[in-house]
Amino acid sequence: MTVQKLKLMTIVGTRPEVIRLSEVIKKCDRYFDHYLVHTGQNYDYELNQIFFEDLDLRQPDEYLDVAGGSLGESIGNVIARSYDCLRRVRPDALLILGDTNSCLSAIAAKRLHIPVFHMEAGNRCFDECLPEETNRRIVDHIADVNLCYSEHARRYLNAEGTARERTYVTGSPMAEVLSAHWDRIVGSDVLDRLDLQKGGYLLLSAHREENIDDEGNFKALMEAVNALARRYELPVLYSMHPRSRKRIEERGFSFHPLVRAHKPLSFTDYNNLQMNAFCVVSDSGTLPEEAAYFNAKGHPFPAVCVRTSTERPEALDKGAFVLGSLTTERVLQAVDMTVAMLSDGVAASVVPDYRDENVSAKVVRIIQSYTSIVDKMVWRKG
């Protein structure tokens, strides 16, 4: 008797989603009839293609090309084109991760009565100005099964009234991703290629909408970057998102000579640069998880997040990183302190939610377990 596998569609749209889901995608390819879709929300070689290659991922089955002339058009395209794709492919379930506009494909799946599984559910920074916070709240309450990174996230969802019986803590997928590529990360020759010395540079990544598009935040952050170069007299390697580069060029901002703008780096190169940096200064959501993992592996690095809020309280609980705010004074204080702490041997505690290296297996099993339950209990199918 031939048994057909469950048909799953996974929708991604940005580099962080591709990275976080990389090991999950491989498991889904193995155990499901898996259809991988890229919305094209952020698509160019540096931001996506290089990561598919670096993470040993196959190409998506379909690109939706949702980028429009305005934010409203792009969001509309995500919903409309994912609706058409879902209706044509007819998957048994949809998997999405995170809080980008690509996750709004959950709206289309819900209208088509397709069970929605949402990874990274329940993250909250409680800053209503951020578009990601809006997306999180929408998708968490649309999803049929929420897969959280931490007990913090599960408690937030429970307090908001989501179904307790369909909310699970899987842990962060980043430990599994980093573990899978650990030898290549450690063995990268990126320092030689960029003529950098271990501990002799700062690594910078800043691309969030609130930091780049807001004029006041942009000015404060860029002034802080130049202040870092002046204070430490070390190269500041800025891994620059194309959108950030465009905004910087439009404003005609001039960097200190020690600030080196660089196109987005590969996953393995960037993480090698993190583990060898004097300090990492970033607004990336993965910074707390990466810092926690490297600390647990015996390769701690000073990590400063240039934001005023975080959706990773479980990492802040354990001292895995420091919120540096955006003002020059606060950023310099945070860098000084984290560097001094590492020099003094003051280590962060282990973050339990960031240690599991079998998150992909958990996700696959939960999807297999709950698709038919959602069909029956929510949609009254069968």
Where are these regions (language model features)?
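Nucleotide-activated sugar donor-binding and catalytic core shared by glycosyltransferases
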Residues: 1-234, 244-382
